[in-house]
Structures are given as structure tokens and as C-alpha cells.
């Protein structure tokens, strides 16, 4: 199943949503990664329908989500979508609410890292740290790779089986964007470069403010 990152939290203030969306879009563009913006109607009743079309499951309706979903290479989409209260929420959670199925596990948003490079895992954790400081003060994170808790690359490597396997597969994750050309970088160099990226990004935002 691969290492998974679980996270949950609520926006400090719902009025911060437009700024959060702008920053996430800016970050995705800086990385050369795809993203999707969701802007459901919070005044409309929640509903959804599912059907098999052209061999795939398709869904339509109003799940009551606003925010950004970032799509890194090799990773599941990373949801930064919120409900009307500012609570981070996923499609699964909103669908469970509609279906009147409640479970504490549904309060956690998660992203499986099975096919993502180790650098993507580190990048996501650094992003979550940044968002916790600025937008989600009560953000909780459970990282099965333990990088959030320890900052220990070796531990993360062990959780992901072996770093050699991960780096051998590191072929296209950062061929475009901020980290192009780092195929042969060490794990420590990747961490330093990602941290440097976020420091520069924050400084850039402060200058604009």
C-alpha cells in the first residue's frame, strides 16, 4: 500500500481561503505540477451521483468543497479543500456525510505515497509545516514515514524500503520546475533544496505584503 501521510485541521479563519488558494496555486506552478481548483456552492444542498462511463467511475454533484488539489508526479492528489466551517475535508468525508456514515477516520485527509519519489514526500511534509504556521494552527499530521515527526531522512528511507530503489526510480519527478536536474542528488541535498525553496518562497511572499 505504501507510506501514507494523514492530516486534519481547520482554517484559522475562513476568510483566509482566497489567500490560501492563491499560495497553493503559486506553489504548484513553481513546481511545474498540475492542480485543480474546487469552488462548490456552500448554499446548495450536498448531493452526488456516480456512474460508470467509458469504463471509468465518474461522479457529479455538489460536495460542498472549496480549495485546491495539487497533483505531484507519482503521488495521489493532495487535498487542500475545506467545508463551510474551514475544516479540511475530502471527497470521501463529504460523501460519507451525505450517506450519513460517520467515523472518526473520515476526519483525516490522506495521501498515499506508494509511487511518489522520496523528494515528493519530503516536499509535502515541508508544505504542511508551512501551512500549519500560517493557515492551520491546529493541524495534526500522522506521517507513516515518520518524516513529519522526526525530520529523519534515514527513517523515511527505511519506511520506504530502501533509498536506492527510490532514487533509481527518480527519473521524471522534477524534470520541470524548481528542482529540475536533481536526479543524482543525495537525500540530504534534496532536503536542503526543498527547505531553501520554501524559505525563498516565504521571503518572496513577505516582500509582496
What name fits each language-model region?
Residues 1-209:
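Acidic (Asp/Glu-rich) sequence patches and key acidic residues
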Amino acid at each position: 500500500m505504501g507510506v501514507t501521510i494523514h492530516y486534519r485541521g481547520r482554517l484559522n479563519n475562513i476568510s483566509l481561503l482566497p489567500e490560501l488558494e492563491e499560495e497553493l496555486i503559486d506553489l504548484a506552478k513553481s513546481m511545474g505540477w498540475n492542480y485543480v481548483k474546487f469552488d462548490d456552492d456552500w448554499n446548495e444542498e450536498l448531493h452526488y451521483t456516480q456512474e460508470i462511463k467509458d469504463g471509468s467511475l465518474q461522479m457529479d454533484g455538489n460536495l460542498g468543497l472549496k480549495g485546491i488539489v495539487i497533483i505531484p508526479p507519482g503521488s495521489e492528489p493532495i487535498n487542500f479543500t475545506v467545508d463551510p466551517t474551514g475544516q479540511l475535508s475530502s471527497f470521501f468525508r463529504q460523501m460519507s456525510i451525505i450517506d450519513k456514515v460517520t467515523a472518526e477516520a473520515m476526519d483525516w485527509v490522506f495521501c498515499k505515497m506508494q509511487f511518489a519519489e522520496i523528494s515528493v514526500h519530503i516536499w509535502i511534509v515541508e508544505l504542511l509545516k508551512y501551512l500549519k504556521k500560517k493557515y492551520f494552527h491546529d493541524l495534526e499530521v500522522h506521517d507513516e514515514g515518520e518524516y513529519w515527526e522526526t525530520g529523519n531522512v534515514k527513517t523515511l528511507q527505511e519506511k520506504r524500503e530502501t533509498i536506492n530503489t527510490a532514487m533509481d526510480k527518480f527519473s521524471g519527478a522534477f524534470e520541470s520546475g524548481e528542482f529540475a536536474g536533481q536526479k543524482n542528488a543525495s537525500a540530504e541535498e534534496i532536503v536542503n533544496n526543498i527547505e531553501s525553496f520554501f524559505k525563498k518562497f516565504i521571503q518572496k511572499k513577505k516582500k509582496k505584503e
